[in-house]
Structures are given as structure tokens and as C-alpha cells.
């Protein structure tokens, strides 16, 4: 079991990337970072306003205590001005782009998204949307929106995000679903075997949708782990999260040739 360190001193800032009060990210910078990578956290909560970036604060602090530079982003959610699709997605891209230009953070970025944040992180890492990303880690991500809708994984929330059923908002469904995009950067999908809120089959479906033009992608099912244990710094899953960040930050992107 890997547990976070509590010794490393940190600098904390809250930075604005847009005019709205929620268009901010929290940045934690260790005094002695162990890698030239910034971990960009994207929280879940079914794209709703009931959850915000505070939900991932324990994970962000743990990663920073372990030597990672961390930026936990906020984004426009359903019910806010411009919330829904595509506003929620473009808000996440804007947040990641702001982190990439922050002079106090390493400019190699790995996105780590939980639940609905996994959908947003993988979507941002696809189809050339975020060139600054070098890797992505999905934690119990809602990576197949049609399957999530069919399995009633917050189906009303999926439809609220996309403006209705597939036949009512076909363009939004086509654009937002990660299964229909080309993955640009290496990805690790972590999913708890005991997750009853977003079953592992949702991540498995995304993995099956990958093709030869995609970057590397693998799925790891974590035993005795549920939907929220996967983001718990004290859970055995924490070591797998840090290992996945290490893995994708050093792997080659889609279309990359051999390293020199």
C-alpha cells in the first residue's frame, strides 16, 4: 500500500482563468518537486453544481505532498451560464490551457479526472483539443455516455448535460462521447471492481472503442475499491493512481516515433 507523505512543504495559490467567479484553479507547488509534470485534476459530480473542486482537495494535497505540482480546475457546470454542452467541455479546455501557461507550474500536463471528470479529461485529451496534455488518467470515468445513459448511470444528468436524448441533441451526443474521439495521448483507466455508481463496464466499453490510430490505453480493475475509494489518499488505490500518472507522463503520444 502506498500512502502520501505529510512532510513536504507546499505553496498554494488560487488562479483565475476567466471572468466568472468559478473560472479558477487551485495550484499546489512543492518546494522540491520530484517531476517536471503538473497533474491537472478534473472533479466529477455528474456535471452538476452540487460538486465542485473541493471534492478532490484531499487527493490534490496528497499528490502535492508526494512531490507533484498540482492544479485542481473548476469549470462551468449544468445550470450555470453557458453550462451544458459544449460550454462545459470548452470550459475545461480553457482551464487546462490556463494551467499550461502558468509560469510557476511545469508545462508538461497530465489530466486526472474522476467520474464525470474522467469523461471531461479524456474528451479534452482527444481530437487535438489540448496539445499541452502529455497523458490522461481516468478514475471511474463516465467514458461511454450512451452506455451510461442505457445503464441509468445518472441518465438524467447525462441528458441534462447534452440537452436531451440522443435523437433530440445528436450533435452534442456525437461531440461529447469519448468513445467517438481519437485519443491523442497515453491513457490509463482505473476503475474499482466494487463501483456500483459507475460500473467498470463503462471503462471497458471505452477501451474496446480504441483503434490503431489512438495512443496507448489500458484498463486496470482495482479489487475492493468503490466509486469514492479510488480518490481516497488513504486507500490502497492511491498507489495505483500515482503509478498511472508516472506511466502516462513518460509514454509516447499517438503517432510518435521511437525516442532518441
Regions found by a protein language model. Name each.
Residues 1-32:
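N-terminal cap/lid segment of alpha/beta-hydrolase-fold proteins
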Residues 50-60, 71-108:
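Catalytic nucleophile-loop/oxyanion-hole region of alpha/beta-hydrolase
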Residues 113-123:
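Glycine-rich nucleophile elbow surrounding the catalytic serine of serine-hydrolase chemistry
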Residues 183, 189-191, 195:
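Short beta-strand/loop motif that positions the catalytic acidic residue
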Residues 204-260:
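C-terminal catalytic histidine-bearing segment of alpha/beta-hydrolase fold enzymes
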Amino acid at each position: 500500500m502506498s500512502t502520501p507523505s505529510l512532510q513536504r512543504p507546499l505553496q498554494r495559490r488560487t488562479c483565475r482563468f476567466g471572468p466568472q467567479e468559478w473560472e479558477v484553479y487551485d495550484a499546489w507547488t512543492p518546494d522540491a518537486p520530484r517531476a517536471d509534470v503538473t497533474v491537472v485534476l478534473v472533479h466529477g459530480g455528474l456535471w452538476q453544481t452540487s460538486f465542485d473542486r473541493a471534492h478532490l482537495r484531499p487527493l490534490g494535497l496528497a499528490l502535492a505532498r508526494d512531490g507533484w505540482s498540482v492544479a485542481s480546475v473548476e469549470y462551468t457546470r449544468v445550470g450555470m451560464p453557458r453550462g451544458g454542452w459544449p460550454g462545459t467541455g470548452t470550459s475545461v479546455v480553457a482551464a487546462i490551457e490556463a494551467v499550461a501557461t502558468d509560469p510557476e507550474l511545469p508545462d508538461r500536463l497530465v489530466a486526472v479526472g474522476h467520474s464525470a471528470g474522467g469523461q471531461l479529461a479524456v474528451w479534452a485529451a482527444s481530437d487535438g483539443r489540448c496539445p499541452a496534455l502529455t497523458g490522461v488518467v481516468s478514475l471511474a470515468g463516465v467514458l461511454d455516455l450512451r452506455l451510461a445513459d442505457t445503464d441509468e448511470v445518472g441518465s438524467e444528468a447525462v441528458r441534462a448535460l447534452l440537452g436531451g436524448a440522443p435523437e433530440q441533441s445528436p450533435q452534442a451526443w456525437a461531440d461529447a462521447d469519448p468513445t467517438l474521439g481519437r485519443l491523442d495521448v497515453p491513457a490509463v483507466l482505473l476503475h474499482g471492481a466494487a463501483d456500483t455508481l459507475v460500473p467498470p463496464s463503462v471503462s471497458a466499453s471505452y477501451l474496446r472503442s480504441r483503434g490503431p490510430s489512438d495512443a496507448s490505453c489500458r484498463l486496470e480493475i482495482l479489487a475492493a475499491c468503490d466509486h469514492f475509494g479510488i480518490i481516497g489518499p488513504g486507500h490502497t488505490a492511491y498507489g495505483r493512481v500515482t503509478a498511472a500518472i508516472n506511466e502516462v507522463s513518460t509514454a509516447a503520444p499517438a503517432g510518435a516515433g521511437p525516442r532518441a
